[in-house]
Amino acid sequence: MKLSDIADNAGSRKKRMRVGRGIGSGKGKQSGRGGKGQTARSGVRIKGFEGGQMPMHRRLPKRGFNNIFRVEFAEINLDRLQEAVDAKKIDAGSVVNVEALVKGGVLRRAKGGLRLLGRGELKSKLNIEVHGATKTAIAAVEKAGGSVKILAPAKEEGEAA
């Protein structure tokens, strides 16, 4: 057997049908698309249309709303802070705040402020300034000999002080 002897099985590749080549071909005139109108044209799929049945997006009830005043906090856990101290990304002696974390590459940004969460263990004594913190996080920082200062909510750029 040679590479030149290899061929597809008979009938495995069906010949492409060229449509619109006269009624004698069997696929002339409407080319198998039914009647006229929108669906006879190319590239048309009516999104969400279920053949006249009430579509899913109208069968389901509306719920909730989008609060335009919602504040999104960047969140950081204690274990991540400890990793940053161990990797010398932040200095344990100085104040740990948003600016220090961004400068050290721990956070990318904290637009609405920073919130401290209590997952993990903190061994270093840190003085932390955040916009929010959980009770367990505050307790863990104070147990390690540090302190947590809660700041006023961060103001958006262009917002009146």
Swiss-Prot record:
Keyword Ion transport: no
Entry keyword set: Ribonucleoprotein, Ribosomal protein, RNA-binding, rRNA-binding
Gene Ontology MF terms: rRNA binding; structural constituent of ribosome
Pfam families tied to this protein: Ribosomal_L27A
Region (Disordered): 1-42
Composition bias type Gly residues, residue spans: 21-37
Summary of the function given for this chain in its UniProt record: Binds to the 23S rRNA.
Family in the record: Belongs to the universal ribosomal protein uL15 family.
UniProt subunit comment: Part of the 50S ribosomal subunit.
Protein name: Large ribosomal subunit protein uL15
Protein encoded by which gene: rplO
